[in-house]
Regions:
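Acidic, metal-coordinating catalytic segment for phosphate/diphosphate chemistry
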Residues: 1-16, 20
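Short, P/G- and charge-enriched loop/turn segments at secondary-structure junctions
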Residues: 1-7, 94-107, 166-169
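Conserved beta-strand and immediately adjacent loop positions that scaffold enzyme active sites
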Residues: 16, 26, 179
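Active-site beta-strand termini and strand-to-loop segments that position acidic
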Residues: 19-23, 32, 119-121
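A conserved hydrophobic position in a structured secondary element of the catalytic/binding core
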Residues: 20, 43, 183
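Conserved Nudix-box catalytic region and its N-terminal flanking loop in Nudix hydrolases
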Residues: 23-87
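Nudix hydrolase/Nudix homology domain
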Residues: 36-40, 110, 114-116, 120-216
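Acidic pyrophosphate-coordinating catalytic loop
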Residues: 79-113, 124-125
Length: 216
């Protein structure tokens, strides 16, 4: 833990997501060429828009950079956030961040604070409801229903269903070069780097998904 202060003009807040297709036990990762032309892999992330909720911003960035619509997934993760008043009991499932990064931004004194969330691809019915034209404003999905179990969620997809991938969702020239891949958890960890934060996010997310299955 550290103590630091940043004025509004030096602080940037963002969010990222590990997007899981639970039925096939796969996760979305992105790739792009580095300065030497070699491919590197990453999870979708980015700055939230002014006035935007951090969770919505993470879902939106996940969609824009990967092309997969997604929604945050409530999981039995441990956290230290207080419950809303009146505090009758603690809900066993929350969609709180599973990781936080602090990184310098550029070469100045600006600080980037990034929150990592766990999300899922959307069921076919929601994809139809949220369908928009290329270049249209982002349409956020409804939250994951509190009463929907993971097993019932999986049953909402026909056997062998492939999550819908949208083309042209990047909002700038750099994002237009991104490619997305739906890969196994093991492959994602290998490509993201076993000691990197993004690999940790995937590991944490998959562990908590299995924990929720066990609870149900």
């Amino acid at each position: 833990p550290l103590i630091a202060q940043f004025s509004d003009e030096d602080l940037v807040v963002g969010g990222g997501v590990a997007i899981f297709h639970i039925a096939s036990q796969r996760v979305v990762i992105c790739s792009a060429p580095d300065r030497r032309g070699e491919k590197y892999y990453f999870l979708p992330k980015g700055r939230r828009d002014a006035g935007e909720d951090s969770r919505t911003g993470a879902e939106r960035e996940g969609y824009e950079e990967s092309g997969y619509r997604n929604r945050l997934l409530p999981l039995p993760t441990k956290h230290r956030q207080p419950q809303a008043h009146p505090r009758v009991d603690s809900p066993p499932l929350t969609a709180e961040p599973v990781w936080m990064q602090m990184m310098p931004l550029g070469y100045g004194s600006k600080q980037y604070v990034l929150y990592w969330y766990i999300a899922e691809t959307l069921p076919p019915g929601l994809e139809v409801e949220l369908e928009t034209e290329v270049g249209a404003a982002y349409k956020p999905p409804p939250a994951y229903p509190h009463s929907l179990t993971l097993r019932d969620r999986v049953k909402m997809e026909p056997e062998g269903y492939e999550p819908l991938h949208h083309e042209g969702t990047g909002v700038d020239e750099e994002e237009a070069t991104y490619e997305s891949h739906l890969v196994s958890v093991e492959e994602a960890i290998k490509k993201l780097g076993r000691t990197g934060v993004m690999a940790d996010v995937v590991l944490k997310g998959w562990k908590e998904i299995q924990h929720r299955f066990a609870m149900e």
